[in-house]
Curated annotation (Swiss-Prot):
Pfam family, one: Aminotran_1_2
PROSITE patterns xref list: AA_TRANSFER_CLASS_2
Gene encoding the protein: hisC1
Protein name in the entry: Histidinol-phosphate aminotransferase 1
Residue positions, PTM N6-(pyridoxal phosphate)lysine: K210
Cofactor(s) it depends on: pyridoxal 5'-phosphate
Family (UniProt): Belongs to the class-II pyridoxal-phosphate-dependent aminotransferase family. Histidinol-phosphate aminotransferase subfamily.
Keyword Ribosomal protein: no
Organism: Hydrogenovibrio crunogenus (strain DSM 25203 / XCL-2)
EC numbers: 2.6.1.9
Keyword annotations of the record: Amino-acid biosynthesis, Aminotransferase, Histidine biosynthesis, Pyridoxal phosphate, Transferase
Catalytic activity field: L-histidinol phosphate + 2-oxoglutarate = 3-(imidazol-4-yl)-2-oxopropyl phosphate + L-glutamate
GO biological process terms, semicolon-separated: L-histidine biosynthetic process
Pathway: Amino-acid biosynthesis; L-histidine biosynthesis; L-histidine from 5-phospho-alpha-D-ribose 1-diphosphate: step 7/9
Molecular-function GO terms, alphabetical: histidinol-phosphate transaminase activity; pyridoxal phosphate binding
């Protein structure tokens, strides 16, 4: 705390990112990173950028990347916005589209960065409770609002909202913007990006961090009506005209181009997720149906925090949330098959000790 802080800084409650321990031989299942490396095409693309052009600023519009994303999703490049990770894209969306004279809406159990943005930009918000089984009810969002945002699949629950339900929310809120945060959509869902051509109030945000294994490069993007994108560009260019460096841009383009590798990685993660889900359900855990690269689970007889602590003793880190409604749940990132096997062995040992 400092006497030189502005009044706003004193009111902020910053986002707390998942732990990034600097320890070798650790099974890290707490931040939903890909267990697999980036495509070889990405590594080649990065190497090709290590030359004297690094002395020059990158393209401020990242036009080549926008065109690659537009082609992939069947939209025009002027319907694509890119940023330094989807968190930056979301931050610009809050400032550009959600700072209105009415409260914005988002689920009570959701991405914990949303209330942080509201605090930073002084945006009034209202949380809408999920159902008892952690579902979003579209009818609950048919109230007066200054905008709506939610992840799909939701985080940290992993539940998927069907495309038809998303369309219902967008239709019944034609006078405000609906932002769908699709960080995990590639692990079992259908992207709402296909709806942006029909709905000018829909913005879809995605990231290269999860399914394309580029969390270390920080590349995110949004797809929406040209008018929405124009607004995002105005805010971006009032903040940082060069959010993506040359390496990040080249790596992201290469990741899009290697579709077979992308599909193979997603399929392996989905298969391992199914294997882990079956194991957990066979051993006294309740598992929320997941369409993400993680599972959200609780045990009928053991406290979630105790399980997390005992896993840590075996060099396995999972995510525990000390928050109302979810303080008995763990979020477990899907690792490699080998990591999954070690996790299951560790859980088996913990449960045996509990039942001894």
């Amino acid at each position: 705390m400092s006497q030189y802080w502005s009044q706003l800084v004193h009111t902020l409650t910053p986002y707390v990112p998942g732990e990034q321990p600097k320890v070798d031989n650790l099974i890290k299942l707490n931040t939903n990173e890909s267990p697999y490396p980036p495509s070889p095409l990405v590594l080649n693309a990065l190497s090709s950028q290590l030359n004297d052009k690094l002395r020059l600023y990158p393209d401020p519009s990242s036009e080549d990347l926008k065109q690659s994303i537009a082609t992939y999703y069947g939209v025009e490049s002027n319907q694509v916005f890119v940023g330094n990770g989807s968190d930056e894209v979301l931050a610009h969306a809050f400032m550009t589209l959600l700072k209105q004279d009415k409260p914005i809406l988002f689920p009570d159990i959701s991405y914990s960065f949303y209330p942080v943005y509201c605090g930073l930009y002084e945006i009034e918000h209202q949380t809408i409770p999920l159902t008892d089984d952690f579902k979003i009810n579209p009818a609950d969002y048919n109230i007066e609002n200054g905008g709506i945002i939610f992840p799909n699949p939701n985080a940290p629950t992993g539940r998927l909202l069907p495309l038809q339900a998303i369309e219902q929310i967008v239709q019944q809120n034609a006078s405000s913007v609906v932002v769908v945060d699709e960080a995990y959509i590639d692990f079992g869902g259908e992207s709402a990006a296909q709806l942006v051509l029909r709905y000018p109030n829909l913005l879809v945000v995605q990231t290269f961090s999860k399914s394309r294994a580029l969390a270390g490069l920080r590349v995110g993007f949004a797809i929406g009506d040209k008018a929405l994108i124009d607004g995002l560009e105005r805010v971006k260019n009032s903040f940082n005209s060069y959010p993506l460096d040359r390496l990040a841009t080249a790596g992201a383009i290469a990741a899009i181009e290697d579709e077979p590798y992308f599909q193979q990685s997603c399929e392996k993660i989905i298969t391992t997720r199914d294997t882990l889900t079956h194991f957990l359900e066979d051993n006294g855990f309740e598992v929320i149906p997941s369409a993400a690269n993680f599972v959200f689970t609780r045990h009928s007889e053991m406290r979630a925090e105790d399980i997390a602590n005992q896993l840590r003793e075996q060099a396995i880190i999972v995510r525990y949330f000390n928050k109302p409604r979810i303080d008995q749940y763990l979020r477990i990132t899907i690792g490699t098959e080998e990591e999954n096997t070690q996790l299951c062995r560790a859980l088996t040992d913990i449960l045996k000790t509990q039942n001894a």
